[in-house]
Amino acid sequence: MTNRPAAPSPWPARLDLLQSTSGLFLVLFMWLHMAFVSSIHLGEDAFWTVARFFEGAFVLDRPVPALVSAFALFVLLVIALHAGLALRKFPADWRQYRAFWTHMRGFGHQDTSLWPVQVATGFAMFFLASVHLYAMIVEPEAIDPYGSADQVWTGRAWPLLVVLLLCVEVHGVVGLYRLALKWGWPTFGDPARTRRVLKRAMWALIALFIGTGLVTLDTFARIGKAHAPHAGELYTPPFLQGPSGQ
């Protein structure tokens, strides 16, 4: 009777797939969130309309801010799940950390150096994004041209949001690049050319989203500065104002 080796457990692969899927979801959410907040460049009315859309106002005939709270809570749970799955691959003690840094310096490969970037930005993002999402969960009705601008300027949230922007965009796009290499899609001919094309796309997307985010944040800061004497008052679009314009 022969002793056959035990079949490998499928769970590491399943958890790896779940980590990749949750990361992809968060990247797509990040891009949609950027598109949403960028609507402020079309004016206060545009941002107000988009905010009310996500509250279901045009389907339910009235805004339901709890919908935003529920989705923000869901995103926060996905972030926690993704972070927990990523922790599986962290070095467990200082010996493993030392071995990793030795190997990384020995390889001298830029893609290997991206892993500690992912760790640092992911660690910071977990805490910073939690603060941002908590504000959305407990006060969803404040997602409004003036409410958001007041938070940025009067609430002095802009330093946190700048750091969060940098961490989110770098972590998300680098993660997407690593995901594409890991799963082998898309491809552009031979592997070396694929890596070059994807890396150029990675840096271009990082620059695009950070630039867009900074410009958008500056727009909210300028609106918040002008609205500072009336901080706390939410925006009312012209078509909802009374005859006196109030």
Question: Which residues fall in each region the model found?
Answer:
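Membrane-embedded alpha-helical bundles that constitute the cytochrome b-like, heme-associated redox core
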Residues: 1-246
